């Protein structure tokens, strides 16, 4: 079985061949934690969670190193902390917890490693120092350090933009002490506006903080090395962020290629416009949670359009996804088999005639819309089949395939919703939020809080089961 993935670097679909045939290294640009995520942000996380699942299917999860960073120092963060009059680290810590809660609601696996930018300032300083020594970067009298783009001849390799077109669209201030308009910042000096909110760090160039682009170069290098397999992110990151990452990393490590495959997902739009907070046309993940919408339905809505295409968010697309989830869950219930009862192995699944088309769809550049059609075809066969043994085999295939798409994490949501409402003071989306908060507490080694949450849910008739993969399932105690 071979995975084919579209590589933005080559502008074509390529067979995925990892650097190490037995393991895979993947880096994905994570959130800037100044505010809770909207569903456009969430779509990107779900896309790379699906890729993580497919890679785990092919190579086994323990052989995948998936790094997704947390940007916890940035202009937006500084401005929001000032606006709220709180410590910058309090803001980023609380927002990171909310991000984890929202992604848990959508059934996303935790990455293998989730480094924070502020924990890796030393690595960034070392890389910047190296770039200055090789002549690829320079410092200015006002304390800035810039990367000199003209020193890297392949600067436009990923974006394929010309410097002339970049100049036409440039919004850089002419007052900055840059040698060339396209040079980008590696280090920013501290100023009176940000020194009081802990947004500054010591460096050879004075107090300040790193530029955004150097953060990802440093963290991908620290946790994956000079060369790794896949780098992912939204299409809006192709330029300048990923373009600048390549320049920094290849110059800092001249013998490296950096990432072999560059993968980018399309925007989520509203009436044809990109969803963004600046346009005030956004819907947060929590807005949907408050409507008691199954997170699996939101996830399925994201996957109903190919990851590289724009996805327009509207009531119809969400309702269609909700109906499909209900149809699939009702089909599973009709066979009287539970998710926990499935015992088919990966080997059996790979050779299962019912799922060959499903797998081939996902291996073809993550063609999730086609994979969903395959799921529905399996469900239709289950409903038409009378032979119990054949029906059970089909259902087990449906369970495995649905789990690979990541839409079974809220299976009990539909099954137990009425019981929860009748027997508990906690509603389903609140259960998911509390579970995510408990997982974060365990990661923070706050065992008292983790135990308190378990006890709180238990007192409301909800039993938790911690699984070996780090996730937690729940059920109603009847």
From Swiss-Prot:
* A GO MF label: ATP binding
Q: What reactions does this protein catalyze? A: tRNA(Cys) + L-cysteine + ATP = L-cysteinyl-tRNA(Cys) + AMP + diphosphate
Q: Which family does it belong to?
A: Belongs to the class-I aminoacyl-tRNA synthetase family.
Taxonomic lineage of this organism? Answer: Bacteria, Pseudomonadati, Pseudomonadota, Alphaproteobacteria, Rickettsiales
Residue ranges of the motif 'HIGH' region: 31-41
Which residues are ATP-binding? 277
SUPFAM superfamilies in alphabetical order? Anticodon-binding domain of a subclass of class I aminoacyl-tRNA synthetases, Nucleotidylyl transferase
Enzyme Commission number(s) of this protein: 6.1.1.16
Q: Name one GO biological process term.
A: cysteinyl-tRNA aminoacylation
Cofactor note, please?
Answer: Binds 1 zinc ion per subunit.
Cellular component annotations (GO), alphabetically ordered: cytosol
ATP-binding among keywords: yes
Q: How would you classify this enzyme at the top EC level?
A: ligase
Task: Specify whether ATP-binding is a keyword of the entry.
Answer: yes
Q: Which cofactor does it need?
A: Zn(2+)
Query: Which cysteines form disulfides?
Result: none
Subcellular localization: Cytoplasm
- The UniProt entry annotates the motif 'KMSKS' region at 274-278
Could you tell me what this protein is called?
A: Cysteine--tRNA ligase
Task: State the superkingdom.
Answer: Bacteria
- Please give the subunit comment from the record: Monomer.
Organism of origin = Orientia tsutsugamushi (strain Boryong) (Rickettsia tsutsugamushi)
Name the positions where Zn(2+) binds: 29, 216, 241, 245
The record ties this protein, via NCBIfam families, to: cysS
């Amino acid at each position: 079985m071979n995975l084919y993935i579209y590589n933005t670097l080559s502008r074509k679909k390529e067979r995925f061949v990892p650097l190490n045939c037995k393991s895979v290294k993947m880096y994905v640009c994570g959130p800037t934690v100044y505010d809770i995520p909207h569903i456009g942000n969430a779509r990107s996380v779900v896309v790379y969670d699906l890729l993580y699942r497919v890679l785990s299917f092919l190579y086994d999860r323990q052989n995948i190193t998936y790094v997704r960073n947390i940007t916890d120092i940035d202009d937006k963060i500084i401005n929001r902390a000032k606006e709220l009059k709180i410590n910058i680290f309090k803001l980023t810590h609380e927002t990171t917890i909310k991000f984890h809660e929202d992604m848990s609601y959508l059934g996303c696996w935790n990455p293998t490693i989730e480094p924070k930018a502020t924990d890796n300032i030393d690595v960034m300083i070392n890389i910047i120092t190296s770039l200055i020594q090789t002549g690829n970067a320079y410092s200015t009298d006002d304390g800035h350090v810039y990367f000199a783009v003209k020193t890297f001849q392949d600067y436009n390799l990923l974006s394929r933009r010309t410097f002339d077109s970049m100049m036409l669209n440039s919004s850089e201030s002419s007052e900055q002490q840059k040698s060339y308009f396209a040079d980008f910042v590696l280090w920013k000096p501290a100023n009176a506006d940000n020194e009081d909110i802990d947004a500054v760090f010591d460096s050879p160039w004075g107090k300040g903080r790193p530029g955004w682009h150097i953060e990802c170069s440093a963290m991908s290098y620290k946790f994956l090395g000079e060369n790794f397999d896949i780098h992912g992110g939204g299409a809006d990151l192709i330029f300048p962020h990923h373009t600048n990452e390549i320049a920094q990393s290849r110059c800092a490590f001249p013998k490296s290629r950096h990432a072999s495959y560059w993968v980018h997902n399309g925007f989520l739009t509203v009436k044809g416009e990109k969803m963004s907070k600046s346009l005030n046309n956004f819907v947060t993940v929590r807005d949907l949670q408050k409507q008691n919408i199954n997170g699996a339905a939101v996830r399925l809505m994201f996957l109903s359009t190919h990851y590289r295409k724009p996805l327009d968010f509207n009531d119809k697309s969400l309702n269609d996804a909700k109906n499909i989830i209900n149809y699939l869950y009702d089909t599973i219930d009709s066979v009287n088999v539970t998710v926990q009862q499935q015992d088919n192995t990966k080997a059996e699944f790979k050779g299962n005639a019912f799922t060959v088309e499903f797998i081939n769809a996902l291996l073809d550049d993550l063609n999730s819309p086609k994979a969903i059609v395959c799921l529905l075809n399996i469900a239709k066969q289950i409903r038409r089949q009378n032979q119990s043994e054949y029906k059970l085999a089909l259902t087990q295939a449906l369970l495995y395939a649905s789990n690979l798409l990541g839409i079974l994490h809220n299976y009990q949501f539909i099954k137990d919703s009425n019981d929860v409402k009748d027997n508990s003071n906690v509603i389903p989306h609140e259960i998911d939020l509390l579970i995510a908060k408990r997982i974060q507490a365990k990661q923070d080694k706050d065992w008292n809080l983790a135990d308190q949450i378990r006890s709180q849910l238990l007192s409301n008739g909800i039993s938790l089961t911690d699984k070996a993969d780090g996730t937690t399932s729940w059920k109603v105690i009847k």
